[in-house]
């Protein structure tokens, strides 16, 4: 098949090569390049036809087109020669389409070429004009830059002048304030002249001039307040300066003047504060007995004076002055009267008076000093409100400045610079005007240091020789400090300052907690060790009497909670760790560690008692295994001789596990399994108390604190670990109990072998009841679990069930082995006898019927095993899942038919 590409306008044609049968003649994308709707050759309408290509033409217009990828894809379908041929055909097709397009729009194309004539001249003229405009703009921009630089220089110069002017005005303002303060000092001096000051202070004696004196007192209050406010104003003004500005000589000189001014204020105000403080405290003390108008007026006057004086000391940042005066004038003399050896030692060489001393101090602070503390708290509250208002104003001004800055962005450059200068100055003023002052805390700075110093002279208060006395004095001091915190430190910030003060730390450092705890540790640990752990474990047992009813048993259990004295001693020792007469919170971790150590010592005491018994048991088990091996070898050697004899002697024990001699297992009667049950009961009781009662007691005693969650985790982990340690004793004791029970239960197992001699040629009647030895197999276990352990409610039922399973498993296995050996022995004997007698009638039949001796033995075994299963069920063991019994049952199950035959 061939396809012609014709150029209708030029009459030429492009003819493709003959068609070929290859993949290149197919359009793999499912499309063919056709300009017409038909499939025939081109017509005069200009439609072209060509061979379908091995690629799609859309691939060339894709944004992800890559030559290497294109060639690789095409090579997967056709060879390179076919691709090259198709590309050439497609190129010719594109050329043909381009020619057709030009011929179709030839008139437009020709018009376009005509319209472009002379256009290059216009472009050249436009380029020249553009270059001229560009140079003019550049020169204008240079002029603008020069003018802008000049304007910025002028603005900076103006800014510098304004800043200097501002600093000069600030200097003048501060200087004027200093001069005004000098005038205030002169007025204060005139008012506080010794003669005038005495006149003011003698209000109680001169009743006629009382009103005049009070007016003078108002003037004095006003003067001190003005001095304080003026100094505060100077501080604010100085705080507006930057660090560089403060280095100026004029401001350095001002700083020195301000320091001198601060000292001068202290010098002037201190005597006024001292006299007013004395009078105020004395008036408060006297008002408890005498109340009149003069005292009340004087008290109000002194209160106002103290208020402004404290405010002034706070402003000049000299809080140590009122602290020192209050401590020296008020606290020290009174504490010297209260804290004395006479008051402390009511009885000679004792500290019985410490409680009264602390009560007297609290009473003194409440009655004489509480009003003064109220004044200091009022100043603290006012300061807090003032700082809060300053913070709010600062935030508002910052918001306003941000708004101004946003508005200023649309102004011209000069306005922006000016506004920025002003805004920066405003920001500096508001930011630096916030001056932080300290709160007054006379309790931590005046009262507590004097208390610490006064108590330090009496070493007997902190003596650790007698733990009970040490604990008593400590808790009196602890309650005393707590009373001060509750009554006088209601503010959280003041309470924090109080507890972080050096005097607070110094007071508690006087108490030698390490020595006290060592004494407590020695007292508790040695008492537990020597009084309870030096006695052998089984000698401590207090066993309940047998002739009591269940109710009486319960009452006895309540009266004597534990059977071991060491368990009761452990309880008493643990109680001492958290008792109100021993526990100190600062030693919480040490007392908790002692608590855990006591439990560990109790565990070690019981464990040390078990170790020799476990070693003895291990040796006996090894001897037992050796005996079993020797018996098996002897049995294999003599098995032929033992079956030839018609009436052989009873063979040795046929069980796989020989019983351990009860005379060597636990030769001490006190260390019997019954006594071990009481030990297990004590372990469960004390473990229950530790995990519940003592855990709650410890958490309650320690109380709530910041790291409460972490403390609870430590307590839980420690108690859990101790309880796990105690629980590990239970399996060890259980093994001793179980092995003793196994040896006791296996003693009757040898009776099984006597069934052969019982029914062999004895003409015994057919058995109808189980043998007596079956009950003896269970009797030791039944007595222990159903009688001894049943009255001890603290032993869990699952422990009793585990004991039953552990004991009955080897007993049942031994029963199975003995029954198997018996059946095999009787069967072999019958076979040999039958061969010897040949065809004679067997002599093993009885007069009671046709049942043989072999059948009687088998029937007796079946009855015994069936009864044994009933006994096992009484212990709560499911026979359907108890594998040892299922194996035993399978041996005697075929003999069940003998009962059915007998019934017939």
UniProtKB/Swiss-Prot annotation:
Cellular compartments annotated: Golgi apparatus membrane
InterPro entries xref list: COG2, COG_complex_COG2_C, COG_su2_N
Compositional bias annotation for Low complexity: 388-424, 652-663
Gene name tied to this protein: cog2
Its biological purpose: Required for normal Golgi function.
Family of the protein in this entry: Belongs to the COG2 family.
Keywords tagged on the record: Golgi apparatus, Membrane, Protein transport, Transport
Listed Pfam families: COG2_C (PF12022), COG2_N (PF06148)
The name this protein goes by in its record: Conserved oligomeric Golgi complex subunit 2
Assembly behavior: Component of the conserved oligomeric Golgi complex which is composed of eight different subunits and is required for normal Golgi morphology and localization.
GO cellular component, one term: Golgi membrane
Keyword presence, Transmembrane: no
Keyword Transport part of the UniProt annotation: yes
Chain segments annotated as coiled-coil in the UniProt record: none
GO-annotated biological processes: Golgi organization; intra-Golgi vesicle-mediated transport; protein transport
Residue numbers spanned by region Disordered: 384-424, 644-669
Organism: Dictyostelium discoideum (Social amoeba)
Domain of life of the source: Eukaryota
Membrane topology: Peripheral membrane protein
């Amino acid at each position: 098949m061939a396809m012609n590409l014709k150029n209708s306008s030029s009459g030429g044609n492009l003819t493709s090569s003959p068609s070929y049968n290859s993949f290149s003649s197919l359009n793999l994308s499912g499309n063919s390049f056709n300009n017409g709707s038909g499939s025939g050759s081109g017509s005069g309408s200009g439609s072209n036809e060509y061979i379908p290509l091995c690629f799609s033409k859309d691939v060339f217009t894709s944004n992800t087109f890559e030559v290497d990828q294109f060639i690789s894809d095409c090579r997967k379908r056709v060879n390179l020669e076919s691709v090259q041929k198709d590309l050439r055909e497609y190129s010719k097709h594109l050329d043909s389409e381009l020619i057709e397009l030009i011929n179709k729009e030839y008139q437009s194309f020709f018009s376009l070429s005509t319209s472009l004539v002379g256009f290059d001249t216009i472009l050249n003229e436009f380029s020249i004009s553009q270059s001229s405009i560009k140079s003019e703009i550049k020169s204008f921009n240079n002029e603008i830059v020069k003018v802008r630089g000049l304007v910025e220089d002028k603005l900076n110069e103006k800014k510098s002048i304004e800043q200097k002017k501002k600093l000069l005005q600030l200097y003048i303002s501060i200087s004027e304030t200093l001069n005004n303060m000098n005038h205030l000092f002169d007025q204060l001096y005139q008012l506080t002249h010794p003669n005038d000051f005495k006149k003011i202070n003698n209000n109680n004696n001169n009743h006629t001039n009382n009103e005049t004196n009070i007016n003078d007192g108002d003037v004095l209050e006003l003067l001190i307040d003005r001095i304080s406010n003026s100094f505060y104003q100077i501080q604010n003004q100085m705080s507006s300066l930057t660090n560089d500005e403060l280095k100026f000589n004029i401001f350095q000189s001002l700083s020195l003047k301000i320091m001198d001014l601060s000292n001068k204020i202290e010098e002037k105000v201190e005597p006024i504060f001292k006299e007013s403080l004395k009078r105020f405290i004395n008036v408060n003390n006297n008002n408890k007995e005498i109340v009149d108008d003069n005292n009340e007026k004087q008290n109000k006057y002194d209160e106002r004076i103290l208020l402004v004086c404290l405010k002034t000391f706070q402003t000049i940042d000299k809080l140590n002055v009122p602290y020192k005066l209050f401590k020296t004038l008020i606290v020290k003399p009174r504490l010297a009267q209260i804290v004395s050896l006479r008051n402390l030692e009511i009885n000679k060489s004792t500290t019985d008076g410490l409680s009264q001393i602390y009560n007297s101090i609290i009473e003194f602070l409440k009655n004489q000093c509480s009003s003064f503390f109220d004044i200091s708290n009022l100043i603290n509250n006012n300061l807090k409100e003032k700082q809060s208002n300053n913070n709010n104003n600062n935030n508002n001004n910052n918001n306003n400045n941000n708004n101004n800055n946003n508005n200023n962005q649309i102004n011209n450059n000069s306005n922006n610079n000016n506004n920025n200068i002003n805004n920066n100055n405003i920001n500096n003023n508001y930011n630096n005007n916030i001056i932080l002052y300290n709160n007054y805390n006379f309790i931590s700075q005046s009262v507590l240091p004097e208390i610490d110093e006064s108590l330090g002279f009496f070493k007997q208060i902190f003596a650790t020789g007698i733990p009970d006395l040490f604990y008593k004095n400590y808790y009196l001091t602890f309650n005393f400090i707590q009373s001060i915190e509750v009554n006088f430190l209601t503010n959280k910030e003041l309470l924090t300052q109080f507890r972080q003060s050096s005097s607070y730390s110094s007071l508690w450092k006087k108490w030698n907690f390490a020595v006290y705890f060592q004494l407590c540790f020695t007292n508790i640990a040695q008492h537990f060790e020597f009084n309870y752990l030096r006695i052998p474990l089984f000698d401590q047992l207090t066993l309940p009497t047998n002739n009591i009813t269940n109710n009486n048993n319960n009452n006895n259990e309540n009266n004597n909670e534990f059977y071991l004295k060491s368990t009761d001693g452990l309880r008493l020792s643990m109680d001492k760790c958290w008792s109100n007469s021993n526990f100190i919170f600062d030693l919480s971790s040490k007392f908790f560690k002692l608590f855990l150590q006591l439990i560990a010592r109790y565990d070690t005491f019981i464990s040390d008692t078990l170790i020799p018994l476990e070693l003895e048991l291990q040796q006996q088990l090894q001897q037992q295994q050796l005996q079993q091996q020797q018996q098996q070898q002897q049995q294999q050697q003599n098995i032929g001789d033992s079956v030839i004899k018609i009436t052989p002697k009873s063979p040795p024990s046929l069980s796989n596990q020989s019983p351990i001699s009860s005379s060597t297992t636990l030769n001490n009667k006190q260390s019997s399994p019954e006594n071990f049950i009481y030990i297990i009961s004590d372990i469960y009781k004390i473990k229950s108390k530790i995990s519940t009662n003592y855990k709650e007691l410890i958490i309650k005693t320690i109380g709530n604190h910041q790291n409460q969650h972490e403390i609870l985790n430590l307590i839980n982990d420690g108690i859990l670990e101790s309880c796990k340690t105690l629980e590990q004793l239970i399996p060890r004791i259980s093994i001793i109990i179980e092995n003793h029970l196994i040896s006791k239960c296996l003693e009757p197992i040898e009776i099984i072998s006597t069934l052969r001699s019982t029914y062999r040629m004895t003409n015994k009647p057919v058995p109808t009841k189980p043998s007596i030895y079956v009950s003896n197999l269970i009797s030791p276990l039944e007595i222990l679990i159903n009688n001894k352990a049943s009255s001890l409610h603290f032993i869990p039922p699952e422990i009793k069930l585990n004991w039953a399973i552990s004991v009955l498993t080897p007993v049942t296995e031994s029963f199975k082995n003995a029954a198997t050996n018996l059946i095999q022995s009787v069967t072999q004997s019958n076979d040999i006898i039958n061969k010897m007698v040949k065809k004679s009638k067997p002599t093993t039949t009885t007069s009671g019927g046709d049942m043989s001796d072999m059948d009687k033995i088998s029937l007796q075994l079946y009855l015994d095993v069936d009864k044994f299963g009933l006994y096992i069920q009484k212990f709560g063991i499911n026979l359907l899942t108890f594998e040892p019994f299922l194996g035993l049952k399978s041996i005697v199950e075929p003999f069940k038919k003998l009962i059915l035959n007998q019934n017939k």
